Amino acid sequence: MDMNSFSPMMPTSPLSMINQIKFEDEPDLKDLFITVDEPESHVTTIETFITYRIITKTSRGEFDSSEFEVRRRYQDFLWLKGKLEEAHPTLIIPPLPEKFIVKGMVERFNDDFIETRRKALHKFLNRIADHPTLTFNEDFKIFLTAQAWELSSHKKQGPGLLSRMGQTVRAVASSMRGVKNRPEEFMEMNNFIELFSQKINLIDKISQRIYKEEREYFDEMKEYGPIHILWSASEEDLVDTLKDVAGCIDRCCKATEKRMSGLSEALLPVVREYVLYSEMLMGVMKRRDQIQAELDSKVEALTYKKTDTDLLPEEIGKLEDKVECANNALKADWERWKQNMQNDIKLAFTDMAEENIHYYEQCLATWESFLTSQTNLHLEETSEDKP
């Protein structure tokens, strides 16, 4: 596999092709539908925050009803993400949108920000719902169904502060030791992630710059229509021509605004999501390495008899099983994630290319129509001047 590219045209294995064919031939078995909508602002003496309505419709037997409606704030989504990472350390958990911290609580929650976050949270939950393992997570079910007080009570049942601190200390110690013999396939995976992170971050910067320049171009172009209208008032012989130019500029402005909307709603969010995915993947690799490092330390202790060796063989056996499960989970999820990534990025850029083609065709047709009308007008005037 070529690690220097994440092109969607990379060949797939025969087995994955067979699985894909089977999937396409089977009927849609989706049984969990989630919608995030109706953001609502809450202002207290301590904080200002937004809650979102989450409607869940399902035919699964483990749910007590077929439809649920709850409200959740961003912190609740963070809790869910943390619980999923805790339960499935080497699965690729979908990323949440960043929690922007801006001076002034009210200014932070403008309409564009709220709508962008709503879409990202909607995608986050639906990616979990579509995941073959995460979709059956008990905390995910509780997140979708429990009322606010029930969710708050459930959160308190988690590990205490000292337990979490102990886990953090062990994780840091494992990362400091490092992994001596990381399997080759995970070396390749890590190289892919590093290269992917570089490329997707570069694409993100370029996309943001293109949007910024497009916005500046649009703001300047908007001024030219009124200028030509004012100009026409002082040019009696060019009134119609100048007004037609103003009309062409106005139509091109509307086309530009539509293209900018497509860029901000279709391409930029996809690229940004995969920037966050690249950070998530690095975290997944670290967690996998921590599990292996823990096994390596036990094996080393047994080899050099650094501690009581009576219980070590049993501990090593359990850790070997844990490493194998972690590796298998990551390998399976990796292929699934990579296929989704290739499809998402390909679709985003294809849609953007089609949008650009339509935009330039529309602007070209606008000005060609104007030139044709002016040519016809000139011919009519010429024929009238002839004796």
UniProtKB/Swiss-Prot annotation:
Subunit structure: Heterodimer; heterodimerizes with SNX4.
Major location (coarse): membrane
Bilayer disposition of the protein: Peripheral membrane protein
GO cellular component: early endosome; early endosome membrane; phagophore assembly site
Lineage: Eukaryota, Metazoa, Chordata, Craniata, Vertebrata
Keyword set includes Protein biosynthesis: no
Protein name: Sorting nexin-7
Primary gene name: SNX7
Job description of the protein: Involved in the regulation of endocytosis and in several stages of intracellular trafficking. Together with SNX4, involved in autophagosome assembly by regulating trafficking and recycling of phospholipid scramblase ATG9A.
Record keywords, A-Z: Endosome, Lipid-binding, Membrane, Protein transport, Transport
PROSITE patterns, sorted: PX (PS50195)
Family to which this protein belongs: Belongs to the sorting nexin family.
Gene3D superfamilies, alphabetized: Arfaptin homology (AH) domain/BAR domain, Phox-like domain
